[in-house]
Every structure is written in C-alpha cells, then in structure tokens.
UniProtKB/Swiss-Prot annotation:
Belongs to the TMEM205 family. GO terms for cellular component: membrane. InterPro entries: TMEM205, TMEM205-like. It is a multi-pass membrane protein. Keywords: Membrane, Transmembrane, Transmembrane helix. The keyword Membrane applies. It is found in: Membrane. This is Transmembrane protein 205.
C-alpha cells in the first residue's frame, strides 16, 4: 500500500469481500443447509432451528446489501454512470429491498404461521418424525382433509414461506449477477 494508504483499493476489497461473503452465505443457506437439516431432523426441530437462523440470515443479507450499495453509490458520479454501473446499483438496491422485506415483514409472519401449525400438529401427536421416515398414509394429509383450521393455517404458512423464498432467490440472483459482472471486469488472473 502506498504511504497514506490506498483507500480506493481498500474500498474495492471490502466491496468484493462483503458481496462474495453474502452470496456464499445465501448459496449455502438456500441450496445446502435447509435441505440437509430437513432430511436429518425431526420436523418440529427443523422448524425451531430455522426460526432461530433465518432472522440473523435475513438481517445479515440486508446489512451486506446496504454496505455494498453505499460503497458503490459513493464511488460513482451519478451523471456519468455506465449501463453496467447503473445495473449494479439497481441490483444491489433490489437485493436490499428484498432482504429488508424478508427480514422485517415476511420472516416474522412465516415463523408465527409455523408456530400455529406446530401447535395443532403437537395436539395430534405429529412433528417428532424425520420427513420421509413414515410408512403408510400421510398423517399430515389426513389432518388437512379432516381439519379446515389446520388446512387454512397451512395455506397461510405456505403463502408467507413462498413469498419469502421468492425474495431470497431474488437476492441470490441479484448478488450473483453483481459478482459475475465484477468477474467479467477482471483484466487478468
């Protein structure tokens, strides 16, 4: 580093580390850990673990998007943005928006809906099994068919869970496109 420091180089490193760290975390949580935990833990234990992890995950995603957006926005003259620079700012703003919606609105509602579902399931002796381990008729399907309250709770949970998943995939895609753009700008390895 030059005497007095190379602030531009440091900012670029922070931007790349935060963006790649956020994307790596998102890839792991989205495509690896959830599937492993779902197949390995009893249903209600899995829900408990996810209810503890997701608030941190969404808030960390939100914080990383905010840091990256601030770094990128402060490094460019707004009147002279190239298409790629404007696209990157848009993608980071989209990631920040989706992560914020997930952290502040969808996650608390999804978790509350999950607890309501689990309450009904526990009353019926369900939730202690590992998914895929049950032989015979599906007790959850039978419960849905017999209990309209449970069926409505389940629809509510899957509505919030589906919206949360879409927001999360939007963040993964936005950050992935930003990383791809940065990689394409590298002149040599």
């Amino acid at each position: 580093m030059e005497e007095g420091g190379n602030l531009g180089g440091l900012i670029k490193m922070v931007h790349l580390l935060v963006l790649s760290g956020a994307w790596g975390m998102q890839m792991w949580v989205t495509f690896v850990s959830g599937f492993l935990l779902f197949r390995s833990l009893p249903r209600h234990t899995f829900g408990l673990v996810q209810s503890k992890l997701f608030p941190f995950y969404f808030h960390i995603s939100m914080g990383c998007a905010f840091v990256n957006l601030c770094i990128l926005a402060s490094q460019h003259a707004w009147a002279q943005l190239t298409f790629w620079e404007a696209s990157q700012l848009y993608l980071l703003f989209l990631s920040l928006t989706l992560a914020t919606v997930n952290a502040r609105w969808l996650e608390p509602r999804t978790t509350a809906a999950m607890w309501a579902l689990q309450t009904v399931e526990k009353e019926r002796g369900l939730g202690g099994e590992v998914p895929g381990s049950h032989q015979g008729p599906d007790p959850y399907r039978q419960l849905r068919e017999k209990d309209p309250k449970y069926s409505a709770l389940r629809q509510n949970f899957f509505r919030y869970h589906g919206l949360s998943s879409l927001c999360n995939l939007g963040c993964v895609l936005s950050n992935g496109l930003c990383l791809a753009g940065l990689a394409l700008e590298i002149r040599s390895l």
